[in-house]
Amino acid sequence: FRSSFKLKEKDKKYIEEAIEALMECQLLVDSKTTETDIKKNISIELTNNCNLHCVHCCVEAGEKRKKDLSTEEIIDIFNKCISWNPKMITLSGGEPLLRKDFKELLVYLRSNYNGHIGVSTNGTLITNSNADLLVKYADQIDISIDGVDEETCSIVRGKGVFENVIRNIKVLQDKGFNNVSLSMVFSDKNEYLEPAFLELNRQLGTTPITRVFAEIGRGKDSKNIFSDKGIDDVYIPETFLDLNSKQQLGVRTCSAGRNQLFVRYNGEVYPCPSYMKREYCLGNILKVQKIDELLVDSEGKKDIQELMLKTDMLYGKKCANCELSLFCWTCPGE
C-alpha cells in the first residue's frame, strides 16, 4: 500500500499509525481480496460511427464513417473477452445499433457468455423490431440523454433527440424491459438541473446515472458549455454528497487496466475511456491470443497500475508532487 503512492516518509508513517488506530477501534478491518473477488468489466466499442454529434463525446464519435472491424474480427474479440472471464461486457460506440450485423453479434455473445451484457446507446435508433432483440438478449440498457427537456438536451445532443429517446424508453418498457438507466453529464454550469434529472428518472422508472464532465475527446473543445472552473477547482455532484444515501462507505481505487478495460473500434485496448492517448494503449487485442498478454510489461510484470504510477498516468504531471493526491477522490483520467 505504502509503496503505491508518492508520499513523504513522514506522511507514510502517519497514515500507518492512523490505520493501526482505526483497526484497534474496529472501525477498520483487514479484508483480503482474492482474484475471485475482483469483478472484471470490459467495454467494447463496436463502431466509432454515430448518428449524433454530441459536443462532449469522449471518443469523438460521429458521421466520419471510420472503417469498422468485420463480423469475424468482432467475434474474435468477443471470444478473447469471454476467456478473460469478466462479470460484465458492455457493447458501446459510437452508436452500436448502426452496425448492420448488430443482431448477429448480440445473439452470438449471449449464446457464448453467461455474464451480464450491457448495451450503451443514444436511444434514438431503438425500434419495435430491435427492441425485441434487446429485451431478449441484453441484461441492461444504458441511454445517454444529457438533458431534462428538449431545450437542455438539444444543446448537447441536437434537436429532437429528447422526445425520441423518451418515446423509445417506453417502447422497451411496454415489452417488459425495465433495467434501463439514463445518464447525464454535469458540471458547475448545469448542476442546477440535477434535481430535475432525478425527477425525470423517477417519473420514467429508470435508473439515474450522474457523470462528471471530462475534458477528453470533443470535451476539450466544449468546456465553456459545461464549466467555468479552473484546473484546480473540482466539481462534485450533489448526489455524491447525499448524506441520506444508503450506499455503504468503503475504500475505492481506480480499476483502469486492472479489472476494467476498453476495446476501441479498431481493436486497440486502453485501461478505460478516460485514458485513450496513444501512450496509454496496451496493444491490439487482435494481435494476441489472450488479453493477459496485453497486461504484461517488458519484464513480465502484471501490475498495470504500477506501470501507470511509473508513467504518472494515475496522478499526472500536474499532480505528481501533490502531498494530498492519495486522498483525491476524483477520476484520475479527468
Regions found by a protein language model. Name each.
Residues 36-37, 41-72, 84:
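Canonical Radical SAM [4Fe-4S] cluster-binding loop centered on the CxxxCxxC motif
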Residues 71-92, 99-212:
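Radical SAM/AdoMet-radical enzyme domain recognition
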Residues 177, 215-249, 274-321:
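C-terminal accessory region of radical SAM enzymes
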Residues 263-264:
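Short, acidic, Ser/Thr-enriched surface-loop or helix-capping motifs
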Residues 49-59, 271-274, 316-334:
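Local cysteine-cluster metal-coordination motifs and their immediate loop/turn environment
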Residues 63-65, 149-156, 219-221:
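A short acidic, helix-capping loop that chelates divalent metal ions and anchors anionic groups
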Residues 1-47:
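Long, charge-rich, low-complexity alpha-helical segments
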